[in-house]
């Protein structure tokens, strides 16, 4: 079965709401329309569906096939196009744990709906993504639960001797694939080991694996996140050779340089930069903050570009650099935590339901402080004229930078794309950070964005916040991403 190359996600990093949305914050029915739109008009071959939050719709398959019959008759869901469920991780997200079971129970129902629609056996959903994977046990529990309790219940006998299968019918598909999503430092360093343990003893010929790019940037800095992705991709290549199982890495990219720098106009650069990745995510900003023709062209390139081979990497040298850089990055974030949280209150939402929880609950903890989620965090810092990509940069020596450029050739491009939106006069941009990136880059600042951030800073200083959200959106519109 063909593995998708371009996964549309529901990450709310867009400035502009899509034309089909009833209001700026997308609700449940909007997300049904969105799934159809990305398949039929934009050309994505996969939609990730977050199975969490108050507006989650477990009847997404039925609604898609009912509302858009003509399209889905010609494009078989589960074969030509994928709908991939992102489930809660009960090990971390205790409050959402039982949603996992509800979601797994919905898979056979979707199978029945699709089989009736197509007049043949059809599995529209047969994979789930497990966030915050930290061990093979987390993956095996889901795989086993489906086999033993969802599929397995058909063998149970009721009081009158009738089996569940005879009474209700067969439960299909017979098994599901579990895609591990690695989101933190330890998870990425052990991603190949955990995946190998999960594969052990199973008759699996192909396995998808997923690397986060956004949350690691927030927790450890952009350079750390990129280097951790490189290590994991290299390790996956080695595991593939050792195990004989074909691996298909997915990488979660946003449009802000801090969160991946994937835009319709730089697909070739980013796919080459992340050689070894097979599937790339396109988040809301990619889809809705650019001309539709450019978006379609970008997605077509994503789907057609030849996957590269992950490069070798000097693991110990990389980890030494990450350690020093991350320490300085976190120190600088701590210095800004109060103003980040203050501005975050005015960053507009773009989805009605809460999305996945992530590493530290709905807010990010760093020591004894809480921070907003990655998109809001990024938007808040850009609004202050302090692109988060620049934080911690002063910790790197010229020797470090030479080494990093060999492993991460796009470093200069990503920093340049970010630094143009810095405000060199911002009181929140430290002198040591400013001098270090100006020496490295000689940036050309965006005058319009600088002027808007000055207005934001002035409004905060005099506590006149009535139009702060409007100014934050104005700056975001100039960048073509919210956060």
UniProtKB/Swiss-Prot annotation:
This is Phosphoenolpyruvate carboxylase. The lineage of its organism: Archaea, Methanobacteriati, Methanobacteriota, Methanomada group, Methanobacteria. One of its GO terms (biological process) is oxaloacetate metabolic process. It comes from the Archaea. Catalyzes the irreversible beta-carboxylation of phosphoenolpyruvate (PEP) to form oxaloacetate (OAA), a four-carbon dicarboxylic acid source for the tricarboxylic acid cycle. One of its GO terms (molecular function) is magnesium ion binding. Its EC number is 4.1.1.31. It catalyses: oxaloacetate + phosphate = phosphoenolpyruvate + hydrogencarbonate. Homotetramer. Keywords: Carbon dioxide fixation, Lyase, Magnesium. Its cofactor is Mg(2+). Disulfide bonds: none annotated. Optimum pH is 6.8. Belongs to the PEPCase type 2 family. The gene is ppcA. It comes from Methanothermobacter thermautotrophicus (strain ATCC 29096 / DSM 1053 / JCM 10044 / NBRC 100330 / Delta H). InterPro entries: PEP_COase_arc-type (IPR007566), Pyrv/PenolPyrv_kinase-like_dom (IPR015813). It is an enzyme of class 4 (lyase).
């Amino acid at each position: 079965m063909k593995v998708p190359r371009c996964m549309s996600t529901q990450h709310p990093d867009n400035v502009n709401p899509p034309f089909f949305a009833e209001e700026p914050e997308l609700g449940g029915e909007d997300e049904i329309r969105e799934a159809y739109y990305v398949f039929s008009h934009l050309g994505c071959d996969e939609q990730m569906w977050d199975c969490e939050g108050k507006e989650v719709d477990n009847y997404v398959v039925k609604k898609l096939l009912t509302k858009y019959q003509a399209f889905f008759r010609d494009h078989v869901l589960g074969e030509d196009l994928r709908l991939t469920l992102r489930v809660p991780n009960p090990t971390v997200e205790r409050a959402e744990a039982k949603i996992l079971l509800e979601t797994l129970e919905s898979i056979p129902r979707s199978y029945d709906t699709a089989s009736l629609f197509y007049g043949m056996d059809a599995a529209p959903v047969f994979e789930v993504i497990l966030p915050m994977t930290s061990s093979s046990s987390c993956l095996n529990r889901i795989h086993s639960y489906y086999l033993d309790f969802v599929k397995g219940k058909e063998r149970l006998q009721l009081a009158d001797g009738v089996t569940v299968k005879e009474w209700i019918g067969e439960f299909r598909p017979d098994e599901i694939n579990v895609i591990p999503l690695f989101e933190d430092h330890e998870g990425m360093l052990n991603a190949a080991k955990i995946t190998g343990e999960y594969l052990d003893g199973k008759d699996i010929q192909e396995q998808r694996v997923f690397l986060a790019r956004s949350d690691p940037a927030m927790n450890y800095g952009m350079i750390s996140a990129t280097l951790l992705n490189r290590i994991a991709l290299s390790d996956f290549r080695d595991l593939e050779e050792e195990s004989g199982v074909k691996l298909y890495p997915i990488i979660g990219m946003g449009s802000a340089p801090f969160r991946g720098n994937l835009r319709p106009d730089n697909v070739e650069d980013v796919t080459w930069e992340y050689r070894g990745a097979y599937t790339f995510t396109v988040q809301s900003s990619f889809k809705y903050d650019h001309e539709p023709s450019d978006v379609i062209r970008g997605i077509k390139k994503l789907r057609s570009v030849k996957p590269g081979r992950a490069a070798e990497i000097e693991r110990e040298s990389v980890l030494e650099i990450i350690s020093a850089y991350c320490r300085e990055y976190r120190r600088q974030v701590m210095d800004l935590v109060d103003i980040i949280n203050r501005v975050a209150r005015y960053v507009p939402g773009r989805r009605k339901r809460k999305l996945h929880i992530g590493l530290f609950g709905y807010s990010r903890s760093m020591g004894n402080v809480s921070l907003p989620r990655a998109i809001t965090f990024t938007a808040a810092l850009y609004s202050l004229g302090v692109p988060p990509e620049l934080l911690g940069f002063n910790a790197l020596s010229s020797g470090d930078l030479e080494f990093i450029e060999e492993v991460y050739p796009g470093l200069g491009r990503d920093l340049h794309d970010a630094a143009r939106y810095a405000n060199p006069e911002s009181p929140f941009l430290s002198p040591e950070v400013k001098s270090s990136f100006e020496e490295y880059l000689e940036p050309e600042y965006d005058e319009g964005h600088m002027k808007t951030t000055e207005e934001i800073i002035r409004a905060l200083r005099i506590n006149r916040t009535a139009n702060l959200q409007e100014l934050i959106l104005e700056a975001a519109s100039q960048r073509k991403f919210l956060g």
